């Protein structure tokens, strides 16, 4: 399938890995080898709106934004929509994101000329959460385009479908990656649970 698309568009440059190096390793290699200005993320089971890149990059260029994200919807394994549009705030800072991990990886676009050569932390899960925090901790803010431009597919037995594992991973990022003290970790965690429940209910 990849070769078919490569024949149609020479801008597509596949990178084949000899062994499984995990999501963060694969994404870091892809970012390193990319020659364009903008970086976007899309896993094989997720879906973009046909005009996502055009709309989002125009939004970034007009506002001189380094880090942007959009709204999205969650779909089931067979493609049925599971909830309403997940609306996103216009701005997220480092401390905002610690409490509300609403940024969907499949919606993010980064401007490499501003972000630089930051790498996704090499951890087992929640690599994207740790990466967004790394960028935000380096002085950037993330800006939201409140329009549903992607669909996130929840696959059975995946990390995202395992809520207990997800909760443990968030706590791991707080304590082991961000080195937050216990009390601030608890405060952020309470907020994280609140926003996670709110996202599932609405």
Model-predicted regions and their roles:
Residues 1-16:
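Acidic donor-binding segment of Leloir-type glycosyltransferases
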Residues 17-34:
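Glycine-rich, basic loop-to-helix element that forms the pyrophosphate-binding segment
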Residues 23, 27, 52, 106:
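Conserved donor sugar-nucleotide recognition element shared by glycan-biosynthetic enzymes
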Residues 32, 88-165, 169, 173:
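Conserved nucleotide-sugar donor-binding catalytic segment
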Residues 39:
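Short aromatic/hydrophobic "clamp" motif used to bind/position activated sugar donors
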Residues 43-47, 71:
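The conserved acidic donor/metal-binding loop of glycosyltransferases
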Residues 51-82:
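Conserved donor NDP-sugar-binding/catalytic core segment of glycosyltransferases
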Residues 151-202:
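Hydrophobic helical membrane-anchoring modules
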């Amino acid at each position: 399938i990849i070769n078919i698309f490569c024949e149609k568009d020479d801008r597509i440059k596949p990178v084949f890995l000899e062994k499984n190096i995990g999501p963060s390793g694969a994404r870091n290699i892809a970012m390193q080898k990319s020659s364009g200005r903008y970086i976007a993320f899309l896993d094989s089971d997720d879906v973009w709106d046909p005009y996502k890149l055009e709309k989002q990059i125009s939004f970034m260029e007009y506002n001189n934004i380094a880090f942007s994200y959009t709204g999205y919807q969650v779909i089931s394994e067979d493609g049925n929509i599971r909830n309403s549009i997940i609306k996103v705030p216009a701005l997220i800072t480092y401390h905002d994101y610690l409490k509300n991990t609403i940024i969907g990886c499949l919606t993010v676009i980064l401007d490499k000329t501003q972000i630089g050569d930051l790498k996704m932390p090499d951890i087992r899960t929640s690599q994207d959460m740790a990466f967004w925090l790394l960028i935000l901790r380096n002085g950037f803010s993330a800006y939201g385009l409140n329009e549903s431009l992607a669909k996130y597919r929840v696959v059975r037995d995946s990390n995202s479908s395992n809520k207990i594992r997800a909760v443990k991973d968030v706590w791991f990022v707080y304590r082991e990656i961000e080195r937050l003290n216990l009390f601030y970790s608890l405060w952020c965690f309470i907020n994280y649970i609140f926003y996670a429940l709110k996202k599932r209910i609405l």
